[in-house]
Amino acid sequence: MRELKMKLCVLMLPLVVSACGSTPPAPVPCVKPPAPPAWIMQPAPDWQTPLNGIISSSERG
């Protein structure tokens, strides 16, 4: 049992040493998203007025 622990220790030691010695990767620069398209910035269309005209004219008849 003692030999097994010793073998595991010997096998794990290089992994631990190499992990501590390696440099962490450089952070990725934050990329600014592009500006939204122009059609998104326009006001929403007014659907209420045309629908009121359709509904009122059908109620009269």
Swiss-Prot record:
Indicate where this protein is primarily found.
host cell
Q: Where is the lipid attached (S-diacylglycerol cysteine)?
A: C20
Q: Where in the cell is it found?
A: Host cell outer membrane
Lipid attachment site numbers (N-palmitoyl cysteine): C20
Keyword terms:
Cytolysis, Disulfide bond, Host cell lysis by virus, Host cell outer membrane, Host membrane, Lipoprotein, Membrane, Palmitate, Signal, Viral release from host cell
Topology in the lipid bilayer is annotated as:
Lipid-anchor
Q: Which residues form the signal peptide?
A: 1-19
Q: Is the keyword Protein biosynthesis assigned to this protein?
A: no
| Any GO BP | viral release from host cell by cytolysis
Q: Which Pfam families match?
A: Rz1 (PF06085)
List the GO cellular component terms. Answer: host cell plasma membrane; membrane
Primary role: Component of the spanin complex that disrupts the host outer membrane and causes cell lysis during virus exit. The spanin complex conducts the final step in host lysis by disrupting the outer membrane after holin and endolysin action have permeabilized the inner membrane and degraded the host peptidoglycans.
State the oligomer form and interacting partners: Homodimer; disulfide-linked. Interacts (via C-terminus) with RZ (via C-terminus). Part of the spanin complex which spans the entire periplasmic space. The spanin complex is composed of spanin, inner membrane subunit and spanin, outer membrane subunit.
Family listed: Belongs to the lambdalikevirus o-spanin family.
Q: Which named protein is this?
A: Spanin, outer membrane subunit
